[in-house]
């Protein structure tokens, strides 16, 4: 039975490049998938594209392609490696042009590069009266604060690009597991309504999509869940057959671990209802999934199912939501905690005295209460040797946000004593919310060209 080998080259935009190169060179892959779009990433990319029509794709696209394109295509006695990625972000067409340019620069002729567009529905929804799920606002009410609206496409557009013999497929917003499902549908001829097979293929994508998470990265917890050679963490690959049966593994000799424990943790990652994991392709059912150790760093996956796909597509909406002003300062030595607490009280009082207008405010002592607040009960009796005060506020106006960091900085000379390492920053908030649109309102389009 034919076996397809699919590797995960990235779990987010800024992920390491070396493990992907290791997969391309030593993984004997058919497909290398780079999943690089978090929820806010595409909104930030859209801002970049508005400033420069040739920008708006992943900042590491060029470096990644320069490293892996030499392995793409057919080589005597080996599999044909193809690349699929959502690094096109807000500008898949410009990203595809960049890939073709790099291929030419490397002397690689005939590399077929496809761009998948159609996820950008901003123009169609700009005056829409639909309400966002997260805050009950309408798109129309956001006005010029609205910067992006991208529908989550499924696997079918990528399948069409593969049918057109593309070596590299560049997309914008596509559901994460759909990037991995597409090559399975194409290679095995799975029908777009074979829900069981699509559910199994979606499980493979879900397990691989975060790259190093399943091979021990996010899993590692020294003394409880030890992971060997974490600095050389290898990214995962799946061996899949036409029945959707899969084995998760990694390149032999790479760092990390793949076992039933790492697979189980990744299985429940970002899953609300295991029996109804909704994607544009299928409502996947993970409730019967099981893992079995096949050998060291090899785990068999079984038990996924699926039902009919949703009639709507999720749209991720990015909009401007004010400014965050932040200031930090450290205190060390005897009495560090008391001085940091006094500093916090001083800044909070100063913000009131000077009339700084804030929408939300956090004032925390890093190392003491920044993550859990008072929820874990009283703190340990031992005095910390160092504490860092962080005060951050969200403001409507940038000028108000600037004043937050300025007040923290004035602690240098206005007490308490011994503060150091003060920093301040202001950044614009890009918020993300969601809504649903009818499936037929979104029209994916494939653009295909060869490198020179």
Specify the residue positions occupied by each region the protein language model found.
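Catalytic or ion-translocation cores adjacent to nucleophile or general acid/base/metal-coordination motifs
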Residues: 60, 104-121, 181-222
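An acidic, phosphate/nucleotide-engaging active-site surface
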Residues: 121-171
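N-terminal amphipathic/basic leader segments beginning at the initiator methionine
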Residues: 1-22
């Amino acid at each position: 039975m034919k076996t397809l080998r699919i590797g995960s080259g990235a779990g987010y935009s800024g992920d390491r490049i070396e493990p992907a190169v290791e997969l391309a060179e030593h993984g004997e892959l058919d497909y290398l998938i780079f999943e690089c779009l978090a929820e806010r990433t595409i909104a930030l990319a859209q801002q970049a594209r508005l400033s420069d029509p040739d920008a708006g794709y992943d900042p590491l696209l060029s470096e990644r392609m320069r490293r892996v394109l030499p392995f793409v295509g057919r080589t005597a006695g080996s599999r044909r490696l193809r690349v699929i990625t959502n690094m096109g972000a807000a500008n898949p067409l410009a990203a595809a042009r960049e890939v073709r340019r790099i291929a030419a620069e490397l002397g690689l002729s005939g590399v077929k590069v496809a761009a998948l567009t159609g996820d950008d529905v901003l123009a169609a929804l700009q005056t829409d009266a639909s309400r966002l799920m997260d805050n009950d606002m309408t798109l129309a009410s956001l006005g010029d604060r609205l910067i992006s609206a991208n529908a989550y496409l499924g696997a079918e557009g990528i399948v069409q690009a593969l049918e057109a013999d593309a070596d590299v497929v560049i997309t914008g917003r596509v559901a994460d597991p759909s990037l991995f499902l597409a090559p399975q549908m194409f290679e095995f001829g799975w029908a777009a309504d074979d829900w069981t097979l699509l559910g199994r293929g979606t499980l493979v994508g879900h397990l691989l999509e975060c790259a190093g998470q399943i091979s021990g990265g996010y899993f590692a917890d020294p003394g409880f869940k030890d992971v060997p050679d974490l600095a050389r963490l290898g990214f995962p690959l799946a061996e899949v057959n036409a029945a959707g049966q899969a084995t998760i593994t990694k390149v032999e000799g790479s760092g990390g671990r793949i076992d039933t424990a790492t697979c189980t943790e990744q299985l429940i990652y970002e899953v609300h209802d295991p029996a109804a994991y909704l994607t544009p392709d299928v409502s996947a059912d993970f409730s019967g999934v099981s893992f079995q150790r096949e050998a060291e760093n090899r785990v068999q996956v079984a038990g996924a199912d699926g039902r009919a796909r949703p009639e709507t597509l999720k749209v991720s909406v990015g909009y401007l939501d004010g400014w965050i002003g932040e200031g930090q300062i450290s205190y060390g030595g005897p009495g560090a905690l008391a001085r940091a607490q006094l500093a916090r009280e001083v800044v909070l009082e100063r913000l009131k005295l000077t009339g700084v207008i804030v929408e939300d405010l956090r004032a925390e002592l890093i190392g003491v209460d920044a993550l859990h607040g008072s929820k874990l009960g009283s703190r340990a009796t031992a005095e910390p040797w160092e504490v860092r005060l962080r005060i951050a506020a969200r403001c409507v106006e940038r000028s108000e946000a600037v004043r937050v960091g300025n007040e923290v900085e004035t602690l240098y000379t206005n007490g308490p004593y011994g503060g150091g390492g003060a920093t301040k920053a202001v950044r614009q908030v890009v918020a993300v919310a969601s809504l649903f649109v009818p499936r037929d309102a979104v029209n994916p389009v494939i653009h295909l060209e060869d490198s020179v």
